[in-house]
Amino acid sequence: MNIIQQLEAEQAATIEAKRTLPEFSPGDTLRVNVRVTEGNRTRVQAYEGVCIARSGGSINESFTVRKISYGEGVERVFPVYSPLVESVEVVRRGKVRRAKLYYLRDRRGKSARIVENTGTRARKLNDSERAALAEEKARLEAEKVAAAQALAAEKAAAEAAEKAAAAEAEAAKAAEGSAE
């Protein structure tokens, strides 16, 4: 493995550690959450459409999502490892026999529809994704609970220290009063 491939693999691993993308292919309907910066404000925008192509490899991999917005076809290319892509959610699995669905550009209405894939592989992928999402939610919930408990313990310790300091101050005052 040469140096460039090694660096690309390291970069891909660090990005995948931060967020994981589900397994998807052309024909699947995706909801891509993208970070958009307008002026000095940043927000997350959902872009939902059909994945019509995946191209490239390693760190240069990208996918094209097509949607119809107000009667106009809009295509957007997203790099898989872009930091602007917050998350990708598979809304529906499509059953197609091509890797590039560019023919959808010329189609309108029913002829542009993609049949939903209800095969066992798609079902397994959906189940595994649901399990992974549930696991992620449980992990985040556990982190929230642990943070809340740590905050409560910190507050209790601060209150106990405050009470101890107040008791010491009273004892000191009482000692001064009895010494007079």
Swiss-Prot record:
One of its GO terms (cellular component) is cytosolic large ribosomal subunit. Pfam families: Ribosomal_L19 (PF01245). Keywords: Ribonucleoprotein, Ribosomal protein. GO terms for molecular function: structural constituent of ribosome. PROSITE patterns: RIBOSOMAL_L19 (PS01015). InterPro entries: Ribosomal_bL19, Ribosomal_bL19_CS, Ribosomal_bL19_sf, Translation_prot_SH3-like_sf. GO terms for biological process: translation. This protein is located at the 30S-50S ribosomal subunit interface and may play a role in the structure and function of the aminoacyl-tRNA binding site. PANTHER family: LARGE RIBOSOMAL SUBUNIT PROTEIN BL19M, RIBOSOMAL PROTEIN L19. Belongs to the bacterial ribosomal protein bL19 family. This is Large ribosomal subunit protein bL19. It comes from Allorhizobium ampelinum (strain ATCC BAA-846 / DSM 112012 / S4) (Agrobacterium vitis (strain S4)). The lineage of its organism: Bacteria, Pseudomonadati, Pseudomonadota, Alphaproteobacteria, Hyphomicrobiales. The gene is rplS.
